[in-house]
Curated annotation (Swiss-Prot):
Gene: gvpF
Oligomer and partners: Binds GvpA.
Record's comment describing the protein's domains: Has 2 domains with the C-terminal tail tucked between them. The C-terminus adopts a modified ferredoxin fold.
Protein name: Gas vesicle protein F
Native organism: Nostoc sp. (strain PCC 7120 / SAG 25.82 / UTEX 2576)
Any Pfam family matching the protein: GvpL_GvpF
Amino acid sequence: MSSGLYLYGIFPDPIPETVTLQGLDSQLVYSQIIDGFTFLYSEAKQEKYLASRRNLISHEKVLEQAMHAGFRTLLPLRFGLVVKNWETVVTQLLQPYKAQLRELFQKLAGRREVSVKIFWDSKAELQAMMDSHQDLKQKRDQMEGKALSMEEVIHIGQLIESNLLSRKESIIQVFFDELKPLADEVIESDPMTEDMIYNAAFLIPWENESIFSQQVESIDHKFDERLRIRYNNFTAPYTFAQIS
């Protein structure tokens, strides 16, 4: 029994039936054209989908396969979007946001989103920082085994935090300075873990990805094995397809 329509994304061009895609619940994916917008959808077998790894991957895979098939300009829709009928899409999405959707298509045409996440070893960085600031290390060592006042504890903690922040910012600045000129737009997000120090998405010309990738690798070499970099060069443009 159908629970409605599960929506994956919106495209500016029709997608022929020869493009065969499989979505959530192993359902075939179809396209529906409304007022010049092509929606990829499948029959929803559930009213609400659990954001499990399997379901998230299935959702993303539909969009990525469409991109591989040559339909690179798209507006990905959030995971779990189920509507009862197309009238809901018209009244709640197209009528109020039609102009903004078309502006987003223009912005994304010929461009792709890539993301860079940078990780460091916080314990190793702390030790390296202390080794390079002998005065701070000596001050910390002198306090070991002593009964410290709250003010002393706060003071030494602030000094350590400030120096670690400076190390972190110097790394981030290198990446930003060398990658920003290659991008049309950059959106920085909060780090997701304690060891993640930078999390950013870049909107770049589609054909320039290899240049961007080489630059990321070049920066990585500058820091030797100090950092771990997670670079994603093929994803739907979730970060840059936001309706304001």
